[in-house]
Structures are given as structure tokens and as C-alpha cells.
Amino acid sequence: NPEDWFTPDTCAYGDSNTAWTTCTTPGQTCYTCCSSCFDVVGEQACQMSAQC
């Protein structure tokens, strides 16, 4: 499982394909590469480079 290979990391603003983060979708949580980051309500969020 990819979740065993990669450790999720906090997504820093401006990171490009360097940080791994958790992606939560209905009924599923997975890890994916962060392609771009932005602030949402004081928290950091990622636009994922791949879908869960």
C-alpha cells in the first residue's frame, strides 16, 4: 500500500510535487502527491496531482 511507502507530510505553501499529504474522500483516505498548496480558513490544503 502506498500509505506504507510514504509518510504524510504537512503541505507548505508553494511546494510542488515534493510533499505527500493525506487525501480524504467519502469512505476512503489515501496518500497522494501535493501539486499545489493554498490556505483555507487558516489551514493549509492541497490541490492534488492525482485523484484518490
From Swiss-Prot:
The keyword Disulfide bond applies. Signal peptide: none annotated. Disulfide bonds join C11-C37, C23-C33, C30-C52, C34-C46. It comes from the Eukaryota. Its main location: secreted. One of its GO terms (molecular function) is pheromone activity. It is found in: Secreted. Keywords: Disulfide bond, Pheromone, Secreted. One of its GO terms (cellular component) is extracellular region. Mating ciliate pheromones (or gamones) are diffusible extracellular communication signals that distinguish different intraspecific classes of cells commonly referred to as 'mating types'. They prepare the latter for conjugation by changing their cell surface properties. This is Mating pheromone En-1. It comes from Euplotes nobilii (Ciliate).
